[in-house]
From Swiss-Prot:
Protein name per its UniProtKB record: CinA-like protein
Cited PANTHER family: NICOTINAMIDE-NUCLEOTIDE AMIDOHYDROLASE PNCC, NMN AMIDOHYDROLASE-LIKE PROTEIN YFAY
Gene source species: Thermotoga maritima (strain ATCC 43589 / DSM 3109 / JCM 10099 / NBRC 100826 / MSB8)
Lineage, uppermost ranks: Bacteria, Thermotogati, Thermotogota, Thermotogae, Thermotogales
Coiled coil start-end: none
Superkingdom of origin: Bacteria
One Pfam family hit: MoCF_biosynth
Homology family: Belongs to the CinA family.
Disulfide bonds: none
Amino acid sequence: MKKAAIITIGSELLEGLILNKNAQFLCQELKNLGYRVVKVSTVGDDLISISEEVKTLLLKVDLLILTGGLGPTQDDLTRDAVAKVLNRSLKLNEELLSKIKEKIKKYHSEIPQNIERQALVIDGAEVLDNPVGSAPGQLLTVDGKIVILLPGPPRELIPMFNALKDRLRTPDALYQVVLKYYSIPEAVLEDLLKDILYSQNIVEVATMADHVEGVRLRLTTHMKNKEYLDEMVKKILDKTGEHLYGVNDEKMEEVVVRLLKDRKKTLAVAESCTGGMLSSLVVNVPGASEVFIGGVVAYSNDLKKHILGVREDTLKKHGAVSEECVQEMTEGLKKLTGADICVSISGIAGPSGGTPEKPVGTVFIDIFEHEHITMRYNFTGDRNMIRTRSAMMALENLRKYLKGRERV
C-alpha cells in the first residue's frame, strides 16, 4: 500500500485558533483512495520548519500534501519552502496572475500589490485551479513521488482535492457506502442488522451517531468486493429502508426539498425554540425557492398571537409548549402564507424553563396539510443540541410524511 503524509501549515493552527479540519478530511479521503497515512504534522509559518518537514517526509512517502501558506502575504511560505527543498526556482506566471486579478476584481475595487506572490509557480509544477478562492494549488512529480500544495480554507481545499481523486486513486482503493438514519436509535439499528453485518468478514462495519446527522452506518471494503457490498446494502435496505433518509453525502434537508419538488408541494414553517434554524436548513439547499415560501420566528407569545393567530386562551390553558399551541401555529401559518404544508416547532431548549410536567428538552412538532400530525419529544443535551435535534426531527417527520406514511 502506498504511503502518504500531510503537512498543515499555519501558526493559527498551532495556537489553537482554528480547528484542523483539513487533516481530518484528507485522512479519510486518502484511506479511501488506498493510501496509508503515516504522518500528519502541523507547522507554523516558518520557512526553516516547513522546509525541514518537507525534506524529512519526502524520504518516507509516495504522496505528500501541504495545506495552507499559499496566500499573498510575507508569512505565506509554502511555495518558497518546497522550491527550496527541491532546489527549483519560483517563476511568475503572467497568465495565472491575470486570472487571479480578474477573480479579485469581482469582489474588490483595488488589487493588492502583493498579489503577485500567489502567481509564483515552482519550476515544473502543474497549476491547480481554485474554483472558490484566489490562491491556486500546485502539483509536482519528484522521482515518482507526488507533492501537492493546496490552500488552507476547507471550502477551497475540498473541491480542489475532489478534482484530483481520480488521478490519485491506487489499486488498494476502497469502496464505501454510508447509510443514514435519524429516527431509529443506533442500538436498535444494529440489533436489526446484526445477522447481516457480523456474519461476514469482507466488509468493515462502523456506526456513528450525533445530533446533526443521526446514525450513520459506514460500510467499507476493497474495490474488488464492490458487488458483494452492493448486495449487502440491498439486504440492509430490505430491513431498514423505511428509516433510511440518505446515502453517502446526502443531507436530510436536500432529501426533503427534493421530495417537495417531486410532489409539487410548497412549505412554510413557524418556529419558536429553534429560532429560524429549520428555515436556515431548508434555504441552504440550492433550488429551495421553488418550494419554500418562508418562515416565521414567533419566539414570544405576543408574536404567536398577533402573527400566527394562537388564541390567548390556548396559551393560558396549555402553554406555548403544547400540542394545542403548535397546531394553532400551523393553522395560522397556512392562512398567512397559503403553503400546501406547514410545520411548527415549540419547545423548552433550556437550561431553564422546565417543569416536572414539561422538563427541559420537551418539544412539540406539528405538520399540517389537511390534518394535524403532532409529535411530542423529550430531547436531551445542551441548548444547542436540543434546538438542532428539534429542527432535524421536524425534517425527518416531514420526510416520512412526504414519503406517504400516515403517521410519523
